[in-house]
């Protein structure tokens, strides 16, 4: 039984990049779907689809750069987990690599990036950082 589906998804993506897989399958939950859509919108992964053989899986196609297949994501880091939650208002959201990376937040207006949260002037729980 997986209790933290976000950490499981991030770990599966990280491990798939390490062994240079083209696709990775993760649990199909609302929060995983929204985070993977943000990763696609920000250009870190190629595509997100529902798995054809199972309705409980998301199929994420990973993005590689250049002929040497360099990963599209350098680092994925879980910031808040079930045992220790981190919250921030919109003024105190930490920048990742001086704005080069992205922090994903869970706010009262849904899951969004740090830039969207600052623009909407809304804070929330810091879920993960990507660069």
From Swiss-Prot:
Keyword hit for Glycosyltransferase: no
Family label: Belongs to the universal ribosomal protein uS8 family.
Role, per record: One of the primary rRNA binding proteins, it binds directly to 16S rRNA central domain where it helps coordinate assembly of the platform of the 30S subunit.
Protein name: Small ribosomal subunit protein uS8c
Phylogenetic lineage: Eukaryota, Viridiplantae, Chlorophyta, Ulvophyceae, OUU clade
GO molecular function: rRNA binding; structural constituent of ribosome
Location in or out of the cell: Plastid, Chloroplast
Gene: rps8
Gene Ontology CC annotation, any one: ribosome
């Amino acid at each position: 039984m997986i209790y933290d589906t976000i950490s499981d998804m991030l770990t599966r993506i990280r491990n798939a990049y390490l062994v240079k897989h083209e696709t990775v399958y993760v649990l199909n939950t609302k929060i995983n779907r929204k985070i993977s859509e943000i990763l696609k919108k920000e250009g870190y992964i190629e595509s997100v689809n529902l798995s054809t053989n199972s309705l409980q899986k998301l199929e994420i196609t990973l993005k590689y750069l250049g002929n040497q297949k360099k990963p599209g994501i350098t680092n994925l880091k879980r910031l808040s987990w079930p045992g220790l939650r981190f919250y921030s208002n919109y003024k105190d959201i930490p920048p990742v690599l001086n704005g080069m990376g992205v922090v994903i937040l869970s706010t009262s207006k849904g899951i969004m990036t740090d830039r969207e949260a600052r623009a909407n002037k809304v804070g929330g729980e810091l879920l993960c950082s990507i660069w």
